[in-house]
């Protein structure tokens, strides 16, 4: 499984407990039933060095297989779901920093990165985090915000994942033994909802390498 920012009024996002949901392109039991459960589905998670070389970009994609056109225009983040990016800076496989993202009324609100002392399947929005920010959720035109050196984006993007799911199913079912070269990209021309946070490396710290993963948690 692929695992898987500045000051705003804390009243905008109410404090609530969120419980973790497992996902990976709709094949996890918690999200393969469709309906509201699919809104927590994590399709992919990416982390890479930013263009300046002094930052790290974290990209969490949710709600895969969104068709172009009206389906993408009408796709929305679930306001009862928080996206949590976990960052392990010391190599002990436990998060040291967390970035939370939750939508409200057409905007995505971010909290962190802030220090995390323990791992848990449930979370509370850290409305007292020193680093906070928000960005309008994009439509056809991408909207970004930059504050305190942290950049934010939330909205629909083309799904970059390449996978021949039909051939994969045939291999699992015993009717094929290998993938074709080239294969057919099942995800071509489909979209996802993306949350992107680009953070200065100085805010991450650590020894130079990190472990990172993402979770969705439902209220």
Locations of regions flagged by a protein language model:
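Gram-negative bacterial Sec-dependent N-terminal signal peptides
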Residues: 1-22
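Surface-exposed extracytoplasmic segments
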Residues: 22-219
């Amino acid at each position: 499984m692929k695992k898987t920012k500045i000051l705003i009024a804390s009243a905008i996002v109410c404090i609530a407990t969120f419980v973790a949901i497992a996902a990976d392109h709709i094949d996890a039991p918690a999200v393969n039933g469709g309906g509201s459960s699919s809104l927590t589905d994590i399709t992919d998670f990416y982390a890479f060095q930013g263009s300046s070389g002094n930052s790290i970009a974290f990209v969490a994609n949710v709600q895969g297989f969104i068709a172009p056109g009206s389906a993408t225009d009408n796709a929305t983040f679930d306001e009862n779901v928080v996206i949590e990016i976990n960052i392990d800076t010391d190599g002990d496989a436990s998060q040291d920093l967390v970035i939370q993202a939750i939508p409200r009324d057409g905007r995505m609100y971010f909290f962190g990165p802030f220090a995390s002392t323990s791992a848990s399947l449930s979370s509370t929005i850290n409305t007292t985090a020193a680093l906070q920010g928000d960005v309008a959720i994009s439509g056809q035109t991408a909207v970004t915000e930059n504050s305190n050196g942290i950049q934010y984006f939330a909205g629909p993007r083309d799904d970059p994942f390449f996978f021949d799911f039909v051939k994969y199913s045939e291999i699992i079912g015993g009717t094929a033994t290998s993938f074709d070269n080239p294969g057919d990209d099942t995800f071509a021309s489909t979209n996802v909802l993306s949350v992107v946070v680009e953070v200065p490396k100085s805010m991450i710290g650590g020894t130079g390498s990190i472990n990172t993963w993402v979770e969705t948690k439902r209220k």
